[in-house]
């Protein structure tokens, strides 16, 4: 992932593709109540660009992103209230890889499987959510592959950003602070060593 590690940065193109998958597919059932389209401006998109994206997705620039599916319909369809995706990438260990794997985990169920939908990466293998993705489902303007594998990576990256948009800044600032502290410690050590060397000579 481009946003991992020292010097990591959000991949704007990937997050934009992930936005497409999230708004065209995920929002059919899931909401993103702690995310607003306007938040994309923090990545460097202009207000006009974000306004256009919001309009295409029938969203309002400064309003939380909510699903049109109400709780009664969720319970009737899935037997549960569908989870909000705003902080899903933080709610699971190694969340971004968990989300990607989950999207890729829909395979043919073994003969002895008992349940609704089989997913080899979901705990217990039985997941209420049907496979949401298929090749060619979302059209990308940048020429990226329109495959389940690409959709899965893109929506995972988008949800990682949605859950913690300040991750990259905090990660890089923290690393530079540690480097600064290490240099100061080294400088202090060398200074003290020089002082004591002079003291011993006296």
Label the predicted regions.
Residues 48-126:
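Membrane-proximal low-complexity regions enriched in glycine and acidic/polar residues
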Residues 21-22, 99-107, 158-162:
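Bilobed periplasmic-binding protein/Venus flytrap-like ligand-binding cleft at the lobe interface
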Residues 1-20, 31-42, 50, 143, ...:
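Electrostatic cytochrome c docking/interface patches
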Residues 170-173, 181-202:
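Juxtamembrane interface at the cytosolic side of transmembrane helices
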């Amino acid at each position: 992932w481009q946003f991992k590690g020292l010097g990591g940065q959000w991949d704007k193109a990937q997050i934009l593709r992930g936005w497409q998958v999230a708004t065209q597919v995920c929002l059919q059932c899931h909401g993103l109540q702690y995310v607003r389209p306007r938040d994309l401006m923090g990545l460097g998109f202009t207000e006009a660009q974000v306004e256009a994206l919001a309009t295409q997705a029938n969203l309002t620039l400064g309003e939380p992103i909510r699903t049109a599916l109400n709780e009664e319909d969720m319970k009737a369809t899935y037997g549960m209230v569908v989870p909000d995706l705003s902080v899903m990438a933080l709610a699971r260990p190694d969340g971004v890889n968990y989300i990607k794997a989950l999207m890729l985990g829909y395979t043919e169920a073994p003969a002895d499987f008992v349940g609704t939908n089989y997913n080899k990466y979901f705990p217990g293998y039985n997941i209420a959510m049907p496979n949401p993705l298929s090749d060619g489902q979302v059209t990308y303007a940048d020429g990226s592959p329109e495959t389940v594998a690409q959709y899965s990576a893109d929506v995972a990256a988008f949800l990682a950003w949605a859950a913690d948009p300040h991750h990259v800044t905090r990660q890089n600032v923290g690393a530079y602070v540690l480097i600064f502290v290490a240099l100061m410690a080294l400088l202090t050590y060398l200074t003290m060593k020089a002082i004591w060397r002079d003291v011993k000579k006296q």
